[in-house]
Amino acid sequence: MENQEKASIAGHMFDVVVIGGGISGLSAAKLLTEYGVSVLVLEARDRVGGRTYTIRNEHVDYVDVGGAYVGPTQNRILRLSKELGIETYKVNVSERLVQYVKGKTYPFRGAFPPVWNPIAYLDYNNLWRTIDNMGKEIPTDAPWEAQHADKWDKMTMKELIDKICWTKTARRFAYLFVNINVTSEPHEVSALWFLWYVKQCGGTTRIFSVTNGGQERKFVGGSGQVSERIMDLLGDQVKLNHPVTHVDQSSDNIIIETLNHEHYECKYVINAIPPTLTAKIHFRPELPAERNQLIQRLPMGAVIKCMMYYKEAFWKKKDYCGCMIIEDEDAPISITLDDTKPDGSLPAIMGFILARKADRLAKLHKEIRKKKICELYAKVLGSQEALHPVHYEEKNWCEEQYSGGCYTAYFPPGIMTQYGRVIRQPVGRIFFAGTETATKWSGYMEGAVEAGERAAREVLNGLGKVTEKDIWVQEPESKDVPAVEITHTFWERNLPSVSGLLKIIGFSTSVTALGFVLYKYKLLPRS
């Protein structure tokens, strides 16, 4: 075969070729190398990191314009980063967070804004309790096997929210909860998939929290260092600017071709790119029908990440920490976090433009986006200082042809039960990594490490270096970032929903009326 001759002549023979130089692909390559396996990583971009990307310049020192956050229970990425000599620091929430709704700012502390209306409180409480309870039915490694999988997969998350919530207040916040966590709209995503997504991130409180949650920490120096330091370890085993165009496993060895017509030969392939990008590669033989269908049906979320830098952290003058939850259709940003450096230098606020808003605001000039964001911060924080930033950075992930969007791919209704079970299934000697294939913290850097190392162990099993039972490995808890168990009060567990309250009121009214009738007509004894 001509390709085989080219590969042999060039001497490009490896045990494994990894497609994709993000955290998942590089985690796989690192583990394989530790077992003495010859590996080559082919990365399409001129950098490693995938959906993590640390920009460095004189204005910001360093800034994560992609994935950045880590927290308790994310033990694999914490172990890997520690091994690479990368430290974490806590995102600042020492001062008060703020909720902005209907043109007013409400300071608060804790994971979720407080609700003072008693009916709305019952609705909120029932919403979080219901999402968590439904999630308990869903196996993290096989959500399509949940008892109610077919029913829930036919529903959008909007339909489920509208079914659960009685008040506009709870419904509006629930829609925002979907936007923030998966950068897509409630009407776009399967209820089954979203319930699974929240469950495998530890539940509604863990996924949404800063303290003791998914956004507790960042890396000193930026998350891009994880991939960069693995690349340093691997040396010339990583090739940048090498988009893979062909994978041919029709012969004894697999032949890989890149866009610049270089050829590489290997025994196994690990595909560590977003599922939809697999469609850019020509396979021989063709991919199985279910895999081919799956990769056409998993769109990427939409987000523009925006960092606004100021001379000083003026928000702290009002005892605000910089975290804002913004419920306003006209507001460009939906949620913010303090992005000041751990030593207090370079004060900054990070904000996300999410889902429908990312699409809408991407059409505007960068300076107009910047102006709108500053005006919003001035309103929410009640300070004209917000109008005078010293620098602005942004990253529209929808423009990235080798990502397609961020944070992660999502499952529209009907896809998980029909095609989801093939997400990790090997195709011949091709194995699949990427955060979308993880079973815990999928969509995060943690999920990327889990998926990459699992795919590496699948290959190691094929090479006879590990047993099948060692493919899935339990990760011990991080001693440096221990998790605190999330508990709920008696009232949170037992308060009725709004509909439950109405039933109680209706029953009580009926009993009272019946008693009155019986008493009036002397059917009850009188004392």
Curated annotation (Swiss-Prot):
Its EC number is 1.4.3.21, 1.4.3.4. GO terms for molecular function: flavin adenine dinucleotide binding; monoamine oxidase activity; primary methylamine oxidase activity. This is Amine oxidase [flavin-containing] A. The lineage of its organism: Eukaryota, Metazoa, Chordata, Craniata, Vertebrata. The record marks C374 as: Important for catalytic activity. The chain crosses the membrane at residues 498-518. It is an enzyme of class 1 (oxidoreductase). Heart, liver, duodenum, blood vessels and kidney.
